């Protein structure tokens, strides 16, 4: 027999999912099957729908349970109506539209009433075609809903018809009943899951401690670097792909300007050469410091500093949050180069195009300016 859920049970499904509970565990709690839980969540992308306000004139679940009890006791329709202070015709229609006296079930009848009573508010992007076109264009450029919303507010402040909240974009993508943005456009989001996940995930597989000879610890970094007041202080790391392929990523702490470098290998010679060549091509005001993790790929950090004048600082073991700007940017880069991708197939020109897209995205932390705007303005002021 098909399992039906009360409104309270449905609410608990969404609450458990929001808190990071998996399909199987939710199913065990409610005595259901994981596939049933997934189907319930899928229709709204894991987002809890708004509770519908019931009119006083409509039958409630408790009244429907009284109807079921009365039918089981072989009471007449009129007697049930009198007990509930309802019109006999109301009770009669309720029973007939829900499989009659013999098969009437309160929960099924209540769920059916909820389905039939839905009067969805017209979707904003269904009504506003210019806005929909803009949103779709930016999604295809891999902008986040928050970046799209903030960019519209900053660049088109007087055009009230071109306003949309990030949550409206998310709901239009995830609610399958809304067709203004096809749910397949979820692939353009940073986390392209079919359901929205909670944030309560743990990281696994952190690398062990590696001793860097003569490495300067991050705790000796000056306050001027920590407060992000000047350009030229970078965070860096490697992003790995299949077939032992790697790229190096660099992010300026103040502007969030991103550089992606193609590497011949992960060895310290290859990494040192790529970093040295790149930093020597930058203006002197953008060559101040570099913060890296404790990977052996930067074992030649002293050679790098002598060649470029850039001081290198190393994070504590298993402390990726100490270069959080770079960690966040690597997540953005993974939109373009998912795991199990061979990174060796991409040319430096192709990597530069990806970096250009990231550098032209408005960022909330920059008040929806772009990294390119910030770094170009900063360099111009020092000329």
Curated annotation (Swiss-Prot):
Integrase catalytic domain residues: 213-379
Biological processes per GO annotation: DNA integration; DNA transposition; transposition
InterPro entries: Integrase_cat-core (IPR001584), IS30-like_HTH (IPR025246), RNaseH-like_sf (IPR012337), RNaseH_sf (IPR036397), Transposase-Integrase (IPR051917), Transposase_IS30-like (IPR053392), Transposase_IS30_CS (IPR001598)
Pfam families in UniProt: HTH_38 (PF13936), rve (PF00665)
Keywords: DNA recombination, DNA-binding, Transposable element, Transposition
GO molecular function: DNA binding; transposase activity
Family: Belongs to the transposase IS30 family.
Name of protein: Transposase InsI for insertion sequence element IS30C
Organism: Escherichia coli (strain K12)
């Amino acid at each position: 027999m098909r399992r039906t859920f009360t409104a309270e049970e449905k609410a608990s499904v969404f609450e458990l999912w929001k808190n990071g509970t998996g399909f199987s565990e939710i199913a065990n709690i409610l005595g259901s099957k994981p596939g049933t839980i997934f189907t319930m969540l899928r229709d709204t992308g894991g987002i809890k729908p708004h509770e519908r306000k019931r009119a006083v004139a409509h039958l409630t679940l408790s009244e429907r349970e009284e109807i079921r009890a009365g039918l089981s006791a072989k009471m007449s329709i009129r007697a049930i109506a009198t007990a509930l202070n309802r019109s006999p015709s109301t009770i009669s229609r309720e029973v007939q539209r829900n499989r009659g006296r013999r098969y009437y079930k309160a929960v099924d009848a209540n769920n059916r009433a909820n389905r039939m009573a839905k009067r969805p508010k017209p979707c904003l992007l269904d009504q506003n075609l210019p806005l929909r076109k803009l949103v779709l264009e930016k999604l295809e450029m891999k902008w986040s809903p928050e970046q799209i919303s903030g960019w519209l507010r900053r660049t088109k402040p007087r055009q009230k018809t071109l306003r949309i909240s990030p949550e409206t974009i998310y709901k239009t993508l995830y609610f399958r009943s809304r067709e203004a943005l096809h749910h397949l456009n979820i692939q353009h989001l940073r986390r392209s899951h079919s359901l929205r996940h909670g944030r309560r995930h743990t990281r696994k597989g952190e690398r062990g401690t590696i001793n860097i000879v003569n490495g300067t610890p991050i705790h000796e970094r000056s306050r001027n670097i920590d407060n992000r007041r000047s350009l030229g202080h970078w965070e860096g790391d490697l992003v790995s792909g299949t077939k032992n392929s790697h790229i190096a990523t660099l992010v300026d702490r103040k502007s969030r300007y991103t550089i992606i470098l193609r590497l011949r290998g992960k060895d310290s010679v290859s990494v040192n050469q790529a970093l040295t060549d790149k930093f020597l091509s930058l203006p002197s005001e953008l060559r101040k410091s570099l913060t890296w993790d404790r990977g052996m790929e930067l074992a030649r950090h002293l050679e790098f500093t002598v060649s470029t004048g850039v001081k290198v600082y190393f994070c504590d073991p298993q402390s990726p949050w100490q270069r959080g700007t770079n960690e966040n940017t690597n997540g953005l880069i993974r939109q373009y180069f998912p795991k199990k991708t061979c990174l060796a197939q991409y040319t430096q020109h192709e990597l530069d195009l990806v970096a250009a897209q990231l550098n032209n995205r408005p960022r909330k932390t920059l008040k929806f300016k772009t990294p390119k705007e910030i770094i170009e303005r900063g360099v111009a002021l020092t000329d």
